Amino acid sequence: MRVLRYAALLLSVVTLAGCGNEVEVELVWGGPPQPDPGGVVSVNGFRTFQDNVDEHWEGSAAMAAAEFLRLDERTVTRTTIDGKASSEGTGPQTVTVTLDGLLDDSIRAERWTLGFEQVNETYRLTAALREQRCQPGRGHQEFSAEPCV
């Protein structure tokens, strides 16, 4: 659903740009879409967003992960960001973001595993997986894509 909202926003920006007025519109990423039952999250909307912006966060896989997840809008007790690059320091990178202490009755924590590929000076999101850990008594205590109760 967010992809459709983003497409509508992009269309209105293009429409405004074609009017000849010098109207500046700042594009804002709305956050990741809902995962499928296996925890896989589509990255297509974010890649389109990246195609239309030139921001400092694109130069770091960890900062791009923070933008994709909209960490600036999340309220948690603890956020952990762990980045791993290939042995030579170039090539694909994996960023794991753990959000612990969520203000939710069922879900205690979320873990996001994000794949990035460096293209010139930017890190492009290639894959996203969301797993969750349930509150005690509300389901599984290990990270899993399975829902909490």
Describe each region flagged by the PLM.
Residues L27-R47:
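Post-signal peptide N-terminal segment of mature Sec-exported envelope proteins
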Residues N44-D51, G83-K84, S144:
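A small/polar (G/S/T-enriched), proline-flanked helix-loop surface module common
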Residues P37-G39, G137-G139, F143-V149:
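Compositionally biased, intrinsically disordered linkers/stalks adjacent to structured regions
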Residues L114-F143:
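Short beta-strand edge/turn micro-motifs at domain boundaries
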Residues N52-E110:
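Mature extracytoplasmic domains of secretory-pathway proteins
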Residues M1-A17:
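Sec-dependent bacterial lipoprotein signal peptides
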Residues C19-V23:
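Bacterial signal peptide processing site
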